[in-house]
Amino acid sequence: MLILTRKKDEAIIIDDKIKVKVVEIDGNKIKLGIEAPDDVTIHREEVLKEILKENKQALKQKRVLNRDYTSRIKEFIAKKG
């Protein structure tokens, strides 16, 4: 992990296209401003973790539904056969 020290109004540039600037310092809180291309997704870490958790749960639910649907199709075919 790269660790940098920045003061208010100072910035870092990532990959020549993402700018992270220290906008405000208030006690132990720092406000960052981020400028990035539209195709770059930016999330707070805790928000991303929640999104990934919800996506994982949705995928599990989809698998259960697909198994149920497949079972019903097999039953239908067996009855017709």
From Swiss-Prot:
GO terms for cellular component: cytosol. Homodimer; the beta-strands of each monomer intercalate to form a hydrophobic core, while the alpha-helices form wings that extend away from the core. Signal peptide: none annotated. Its main location: cytoplasm. SUPFAM superfamilies: CsrA-like. Keywords: Bacterial flagellum biogenesis, Cytoplasm, Repressor, RNA-binding, Translation regulation. One of its GO terms (biological process) is regulation of bacterial-type flagellum assembly. It is found in: Cytoplasm. A translational regulator that binds mRNA to regulate translation initiation and/or mRNA stability. Usually binds in the 5'-UTR at or near the Shine-Dalgarno sequence preventing ribosome-binding, thus repressing translation. Its main target seems to be the major flagellin gene, while its function is anatagonized by FliW. It comes from Halothermothrix orenii (strain H 168 / OCM 544 / DSM 9562). This is Translational regulator CsrA. Belongs to the CsrA/RsmA family.
